[in-house]
Amino acid sequence: PHTTTRRQRQMCIRDRNSVAEALGMSLPGCAVIPAPYREREQISFETGSRIVKMVHEDLTPSKIMTKKAFENAVIVASAIGASSNCTTHLIAIAKHMGVKFDLSNWQKLGHKIPLLANCQPAGEHLMEGFYRAGGIPAIMKELMKNKKIHQNLITVTGKTVAQNLRKKIDVDRDVIKTFKDNLTDKAGFLVMKGNFFSSAIMKTSVISKEFRDRYLSNPKHPNVFKGKAVVFEGPEDYHDRINSKKLKIDENSILIIRGCGPVGYPGSAEVVNICLLYTSDAADEWWG
C-alpha cells in the first residue's frame, strides 16, 4: 500500500506540473524532470533567469493564462490521464485570473481526447520513464499535429506554443503513444449529476476493460453500475467504520464520503487511497 501511495502521489505531482507547462506557465520540458537529475537544477536556474526577463518585458500571467490556454491545459491533462484533482486546481486558478471556466469545460474539451501516456495508474510506466520518453513536449506535439490544441498562444518563453515545439523530439512510443495507436480512444473526464450530488467528476482513463466487462456491460443498462450505497459522514467516520462487519461491503458497494468539499471540510479533504483501508483480511472474514 505504501508503494502504491507513493506512486500515485508521484503521478499527482506530475499532473500539476504538466498542467502548468500546458498553460504556458513553465519552461518547455520542465514539468516531469525527476528531482535528482542535473537537468532539474539547470532548468531551475533558467526559470529564475527567465522570470527576471519577463518582468522587464512586462509579460504577466494574465497575458499567458487566457481562456484558450486553459483549454490547452484540459486537453493535455486528458491526454496524460491526469488526476481528477486537476479539475479543482485549474478552475480555482481560472477564477483568480478572471476567466470563466467550470467543470463542464472538462467534459466538452477533454472527454474525446485519447490517452497518449502509458503511465500509471492507467498504464505501465512511472514519471522517470515518461520524462525519458519525451515528456509533455512530446504529448503537446502529438496533440498539435492532430490540431487539438491552440498553437499561437504566448508562453513564459515569450514565444508561442508552436515555436516552443519546433525542436525535434526523440519519442519512445512504448511510453507516449500516437493518436492512432493510443491506449484508449476517450480518456477525459465525465461530469455527473444526480440525487447524490449536484456535480461530480469521473476519470474515465482508469476504467479497465475487465471492470467494463464485469460491471458496465448489461445490454439493458449499458455503462450503468448498480450497487448498494454505503454513506460516511466525512473522512474520520470512514476511517472509523470502513472495516465494520455490519456494513457488509463487497465489490458491488458504492462508498460515499460526505462533507469533503471546500465548504464542508473546509478546503477539501484528502481522501486519496481510501480503499487501502478496506483490508483484504476483513473481506475474507466477512465473505469467506
In which residue ranges do the predicted regions lie?
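Single conserved hydrophobic/aromatic residue that forms the stacking wall/gate
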Residues: 1-9, 13, 278-288
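Catalytic or ion-coupling anion/metal-binding cores of large enzyme and transporter domains
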Residues: 7-10, 14-277
